[in-house]
Amino acid sequence: VENSGGAGEFRGGMGLRRVLTPVDHECVFNGAGERFRYQPWGLFGGEAGASGQFQIEDADGIRRLDDKPNEVEVKLGTRITVETPGAGGYGKPAERNAEAVKRDQESGKYSPEFIKENYPTTNFGEQ
């Protein structure tokens, strides 16, 4: 998940996104995870990672589910998205190697806006 790892000298790992769609029958979804309500903290000056989330997309649109959804009926044509939390960063973001920040942007881990806000000593976020 882009921008989900906390900024730091050593950035936090990115969260993952999984989309679940029933194929030939309805089902019931239950979810559980940690750091869906509160962000994973950073250490020694590192920034927090992004919280995880559950979403449901159906005829009524897209809406966020509780952090531990229970007994959610999933009809055909409905999508459940699970985004796991990103990890918090370690150390001050200003200490991150500029080439590492550039690689993070090129690989799609961080958007230019995220880099501009969290790594202002680099100019890679201004492209």
Where are these regions (language model features)?
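Long, charge-dense accessory insertions within large macromolecular proteins
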Residues: V1-E57
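Short, structured beta-strand/loop micro-motifs enriched in basic residues and often containing a Trp
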Residues: I56-L65
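Short, Lys/Arg- and Gly-enriched loop/turn segments at beta-strand edges
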Residues: R64-D66, A87-R96
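Intrinsic disorder at enzyme termini
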Residues: A94-Q127
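A structural connector/turn signal
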Residues: K68-N70
